[in-house]
Amino acid sequence: MTAPLPQGELTVARMCALTALSRAGYYRHWQASAPREEAIGVRDAIQRIALENRHYGYRRIAKQLGREGFAVNHKRVLRLMRQDNLLCLRKRPFVPVTTASKHGWRIVPNLARGMQPSGVDQLWVADITYVRMREEFAYLAIVLDGFSRRVVGWALETHMQASLTIAALKMALNGRRPQPFGLVHHSDRGVQYACADYTRVLDEHRILASMSRPGNPYDNAKAESFMKTLKQEEVDGSDYRDSRQARNAIGKFLETIYNRQRLHSALDYRPPAEFEANLPALHPAPRQRAANGERTCP
């Protein structure tokens, strides 16, 4: 026996009788309209994600759709984005910038070359870039984990003194507390990284220093790639009134958008914070110090 319907609810047969439509015709219409409604939902989601992440390409948007429960491949996303004129503008090719390294401070060899970290806090990469404001420039120093790509330290000031890079390094140290002798810190040969004040902090925390070869920014490719992303997705096109506004806006991008929301292709399209949260342990096992590992400041 069929259970009684709630008062006011119509059966399919009753609706078909009232509209002079056969039941077969009703189901044909329903089956044809369902994919159209699903396509509208996918298109709406693509538009929302593209507007919220204006530098996402179709592959990242396809990955985000998958995280939201949509079963759609990147080719379909590309087609829909092309139809809706949502494709990003073609990015300019990456042009590396060589850092001047003519100074009298100690230069150390490149320990990071060929290194393949297997966990966090085994390799940190550091770099500096400029930030254009209305009337002057500011300078941003970052420390990036070479395994998870997470920004673990940063500082922004209107000068390029060693205190800028030291502030970024100390933020990373306070937040991560790496194991002694288990971490390589890689940078270019800039004076801010080679000077005694900076290397003293590395020595105090038993961190092994590493530097790029002269005139070869590709030795620090992970940091350079991050700076390119930062410029494209936050700095370029922004109108920072002063260093305070720049610090607030860039800090939000680093801590919230980049670390916690932006999908990273090297992490199987996961944000760095999520990638780290799924690792079995935060710190690697400490390594033994090499016999010739003693380093002193100049």
Report residues per predicted region:
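Charged DNA-binding/catalytic regions of mobile-element recombinases
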Residues: 1-298
